Design a protein with these regions (language model features):
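Structural signature of the two symmetry-related core transmembrane helices
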Residues: 76-91, 293-308
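Short amphipathic helix-loop junctions that connect adjacent transmembrane helices
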Residues: 19-42, 249-266
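A membrane-interface helix-boundary motif in multi-pass transporters
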Residues: 74, 161-188, 373-391
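Intracellular juxtamembrane helix-capping segments at the cytosolic ends
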Residues: 117-131, 331-344
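Helix-to-loop junctions at the C-terminal end of transmembrane segments
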Residues: 58-72, 279-292, 375
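Juxtamembrane intracellular "pre-TM" segments in multi-pass secondary transporters
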Residues: 1-4, 202-235
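Helix-loop junctions at membrane interfaces in 12-TM secondary transporters
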Residues: 93-107, 310-321
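Loop-to-transmembrane helix entry/capping segments in MFS-fold secondary transporters
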Residues: 39-43, 132-143, 263, 346-356
């Protein structure tokens, strides 16, 4: 249980990057305070996310292979990329509200995004080493803790520094110093909660993995006179992950521009949704074990919820459905990494989760582009609802994956 606790603490720490840096505070600061105008800022921020995703998708199979082939390689590389990610968060303190800092901010964000994805892939590869024998339970506890950790630090920052006219630490607002200082707190939060996993745990990782070219390993993993079982899972995951990207990146915009929610209402909805996601992960982790069924059932539930959101008319309908949707999306993602862990031999967990990262990132830009085109040509409701197509395709391919919990 000590290892599982350390595993969960890491998720508490690293959740600040996707939740606060990518989606909330840092992105808003860059778009509204650093960039020349919000439209340009949004485009540059999203472009950087796309570039980082493609680069890390191509690199992760190599990083994972290196982690497998060197004694204690997974732990060493996890430490390295975690430290780089933490440093990149802290460096946003130096980004002043001026267009002179656009390039520096984007470079820091690019490095931070890539190091986050690399560290997260290696973190996922540690699931078997850190969890109990019930991987569904271990993964659910870790994923749920990440949701709660993000909510806790976000609420603390909102109440003490971001929202009050006079923040608790009396940090001046000139030069947006109070917003820039938040990044120091985020970096410390990530560092503190990552220490147990990085320095108090030992991974079951030796250098026994045979030497094979990465390209050959990729082919053997996904293709053998047709798609392999693992290949089917990775392609299924690629499809429904792309659908989730449309939902997660578009739901805030949908709420403000279509439903008419205020920023405070969006923040409240985000907090409630993340609490719901944590509850879902904990309940599924404790009471369920068949991860393939969890994925299939939750995809169906999500399809219904997304359809409901796309036709919702009132703030109450929208927020209620968003909360319900996160309850199912959390366990869906948690069980996905359990399936990958069980389909991958113990001595190639690094490579396996390198491919897992690739499957979630390599085409992640396609869904938002198609959704954007449908939004432009028809409506935002149709564009948002397009995610249902990808979720359905992922569902049907997932049915064909042969899987038994181990």
């Amino acid at each position: 249980m000590k290892r599982l606790l350390a595993f969960s603490f890491y998720d508490v720490g690293n959740s600040v990057f996707p939740m606060i840096v990518v989606s909330a505070l840092t992105s808003s600061y860059f778009v509204n305070q650093v960039a020349d105008n919000p439209q340009t800022g949004t485009a540059l921020w999203q472009l950087t996310i796309g570039i980082a995703g493609i680069l890390i998708a191509l690199l992760m199979p190599y990083i994972g292979t290196l982690a497998d082939s060197v004694k204690n390689g997974r732990l060493i590389l996890l430490r390295l990329f975690t430290v780089i990610c933490i440093a990149s968060i802290a460096l946003f303190w130096f980004i002043l509200p001026s267009s002179n800092y656009i390039i520096l901010a984007l470079v820091i964000f690019l490095i931070g995004s890539m190091s986050y994805e690399a560290s997260n892939g290696l973190y996922n590869a540690s699931l078997k080493s850190c969890s109990t024998s019930n991987l569904t339970f271990g993964s659910g506890i870790g994923f749920g803790s990440g949701y709660l950790g993000g909510v806790i630090i976000l609420v603390i920052l909102l109440q003490t520094i971001i929202l009050p006219e006079r923040n608790l630490l009396n940090i001046p607002t000139e030069g947006q110093a109070h917003l820039r200082f938040v990044h120091i707190i985020l970096a410390l939060w990530f560092l503190i909660f990552s220490i147990p996993l990085l320095f108090l745990c030992k991974f079951n990782n030796t250098n026994s993995e045979p030497k094979t070219k990465v390209a050959t390993k990729i082919k053997n993993l996904i293709w053998n006179k047709g798609l392999t079982n693992t290949g089917r899972f990775l392609f299924a995951r690629m499809l429904y992950a792309d659908g989730l990207v449309i939902v997660t990146t578009g739901i805030g915009i949908f709420g403000t521009s279509v439903i008419g929610l205020s920023i405070k209402e969006i923040l409240l909805a985000a907090i409630l949704a993340n609490i719901s996601g944590a509850i879902g992960c904990y309940l599924y982790g404790i009471f369920f074990k068949n991860d393939k069924k969890i994925i299939l059932y939750n995809l169906l539930f999500l399809i219904v919820v997304v359809a409901g959101i796309s036709i919702s008319q009132t703030p109450l309908q929208f927020i209620s459905l968003a909360i319900i949707g996160t309850f199912f999306s959390g366990p869906l993602q948690s069980s996905s990494r359990v399936v990958m862990a069980n389909l991958t031999p113990d001595n190639t967990q690094g490579f396996g989760f390198g491919m897992f990262t690739l499957s979630g990132k390599i085409t992640a830009f396609v869904g938002p582009i198609l959704a954007g085109l449908l939004t432009f040509l028809i409506s935002q409701r149709v564009g948002f609802g397009f995610s249902i197509v990808l979720l359905l395709l992922g569902f049907f391919l997932m049915i064909k994956v042969n899987y038994k919990d181990t």
